[in-house]
Amino acid sequence: LFAPEREGANGRPVCSVVCIKRKNKTTTPKEENKMSKKVFIGVGHGGSDSGAVGYIVEKKANLVMALACRDYLVAHGVEVRMSRTKDEEDPINEEVRECNAYNPDLAIDVHNNSGGGDGFEVYHTLNGGTGKVLAQNIEKQVIKIGQNSRGCKTRQGQRGDYYAFVRDTKCPAVICEGVFVDTKADAAQAGTKAKQQAFGIAYAKGILDTLGFKYDTAASTKPAEPETDAETQAAITKVQRAAGLSGKTVQYLLDYEYVVELVRKLAAAMK
């Protein structure tokens, strides 16, 4: 779910304005591409801002999708910078600042939705242009992985485009809302890491289509996994040992979003 501006609007949650010292989050292709392009990926919410919460937690799903998108793009010769690569504060004004400083050819902001709806939607600028083409190309790829679409959309605000990421970025930019996390059937479309990664790869293919890059539709790359914080890893180890579970079984269970939270609660209850 996308938080629009620093002041907030229409009762939506706001992102705090935080000054953050960031590590380099730019990933450069291993081999130089003569048509080298740059893409910025905003990863919605993070840290104390969980985003929408339902059958899945938005900030976590956003990161899995974004990492998969990044890795697929890099594998096809695109340089990528992400607003975050782990669970940390990521206010929208900082995303916009980083994006403009990076000066990419295209930008996307990865989010998931709430409000009881169903399906994917993508927002682009009122001015259309390349941003609209990018939105349409991403939508086509998302439909191919089995998710229905609510359409390519715009939203009018007092300053033109309502959403800051679309309005204030200098390059063509879109906001992707993968699923509604509070609708059971729709959340199931992104209910595992593998399914979340499929969304990220679909976004990447839409970006490549817009850039005019060719890609092997049958090829697959193994996306990076989000970093597991020390507290969560300790809880996983504690429960695994107590239950006598194999590493393979644990990894299978952890593919489901709700299991991670369950493991934390079990570990806390164990003496």
Where are these regions (language model features)?
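Catalytic-core environment of secreted peptidases
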Residues: 37-54, 108
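Active-site-proximal helix/loop segments of hydrolytic enzymes
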Residues: 37-38, 60-222
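Short, Lys/Arg-enriched N-terminal segments with co-localized hydrophobic residues
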Residues: 9-34
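Short, solvent-exposed alpha-helical surface patches in non-cytosolic proteins
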Residues: 222-271
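Intrinsically disordered, low-complexity segments enriched in serine/proline and basic residues
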Residues: 1-3, 9
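Glycine- and acidic-residue-enriched helix-capping/strand-helix junction motifs
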Residues: 50-64
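Short, intrinsically disordered N-terminal pre-domain segments
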Residues: 1, 35-38
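A short, flexible beta-alpha/helix-coil linker loop
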Residues: 46-49, 181-186, 246
